[in-house]
């Protein structure tokens, strides 16, 4: 970030809010590829006077590529003379890919600088570093969701028209040449497709340049959430103390204060419909959850609001079937690898008054998180640790490693999964995962030594795996003091860690 500031101040672009000249700076493309300026320009089929210019991403090369993008007639000429000019076909997409990679770096600069300045101004965010952990979301859900009645499971709709994305970025980028170039990249790269995520014919955009794709998608989501946050704050007469820090966790980065004044005029007449002080919103991947303590009628009003917002503000049809309204005791949802629900747990208490004794039955809702074993087995099968039935198999790709490396890899996978799923209310599924990985490790070692699993374990002993497949109880005994709760009782309680900043790869296979 300090490098960006230096480059901006050096070129005078920061004061003028011009991003377009940065596209001609060679260091931008070096940052995009995280490598030195050593890319051969002859790869792009350029003439000798350009390809010999330092054999790198040169400003002359980039200028010529952008000029070709603007000259629409040259595309038709190139198709008719494809044998002489290799700009058509995959080369055309390669040119767009190169420009879009640098473009992704450039458009992130004003947002990154604004984020740094907002973090310096807001001291309360710097004190909440633990909110970076994925597990920090679940204590919030445990505290809030057990007291709510209804929940809406919303699938964020797409595709979004490309022109809508450009209009969204106009609120943040006041550089018309940059926005015009973005339009050209959209319409030419997608071969006529006007939406993102694109259709199958142009789906490569999200794969070829995931950085720009994530930036555009997050811009669209932030626009939706900005309007929703404005409406929620305007309609709520009791503020939630946990909502402010949660904004940082969901990557709003303080952008809510920049909502346009037009929103006030558009929604002023409808605010009276949404008087609810207990509205909570959580977004994860392509879905979001909106929970409330209100009535079913109130949730239907919010559903109608979202459908009208997507139709009127983003100009595309959104099926009402994307929004499901459920009551919490009958609703479960996948969230970051966990199957979460709020079941009602019955309990009885004996009370005695004089000579009469009687039982008092009570029902208490409790937020629970469990491991969904069937998707997890499918993920392990995809990684070649077992078959689809959950039977462990050997890992032939690791048979060439040393014994210690093989055991260390299997043990590290289990420890990471055990660490990630430490918040599960029921640990039986975790023991099943441990069994699969341990036996898969034994089969891999037996395959390497051309022996059977039984003979291999008899020769080394079953204790050979213990130090690598250390159970969570043993880890907790090394961390927690002896005066804490008994380990058998503590192992049944969910434990949330504050050092998990990304989803486990095996979890990410099925959590879509």
From Swiss-Prot:
InterPro entries: Domain_X, Maturase_MatK, Maturase_MatK_N. One of its GO terms (molecular function) is RNA binding. Keywords: Chloroplast, mRNA processing, Plastid, RNA-binding, tRNA processing. It is found in: Plastid, Chloroplast. GO terms for cellular component: chloroplast. One of its GO terms (biological process) is RNA splicing. PANTHER family: MATURASE K. HAMAP family: MatK. Usually encoded in the trnK tRNA gene intron. Probably assists in splicing its own and other chloroplast group II introns. This is Maturase K. It comes from Lemna minor.
